[in-house]
């Protein structure tokens, strides 16, 4: 059996509240070397304010955690197996920290 290293944190409401900054920081601190962070917008991509949520999440990671997080966007399943889809997969595969949410 192949050993896999990593962590998953499942957070409920308030995932970007000040009370949970320490959870994000703990996960980030466990990463050896450079942190390559991605934000998946799929869970909330259907919402009219999805772009504003992306901006707020990027700002949260910048201000609260001093971390640049890059958007890995895939909002519509009709683009499955498109160039957009494979670009999304490539970003995820090259990341060692992934945030997906809220939604």
Annotate each predicted stretch with a short phrase.
Residues 1-103:
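Extended, subdomain-level signal for the structured scaffold at the beginning of enzyme domains
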């Amino acid at each position: 059996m192949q050993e896999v290293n990593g962590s998953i944190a499942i957070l409920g409401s308030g995932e970007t509240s000040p009370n949970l900054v320490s959870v994000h920081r703990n996960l980030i601190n466990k990463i050896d070397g450079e942190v390559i962070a991605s934000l998946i917008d799929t869970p909330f991509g259907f919402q009219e304010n999805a772009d504003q949520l992306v901006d707020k999440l990027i700002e949260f990671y910048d201000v609260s955690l001093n971390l640049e997080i890059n958007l890995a966007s895939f909002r519509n399943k009709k683009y499955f197996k498109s160039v957009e889809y494979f670009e999304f997969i490539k970003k995820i595969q090259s990341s060692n920290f992934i945030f997906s949410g809220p939604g």
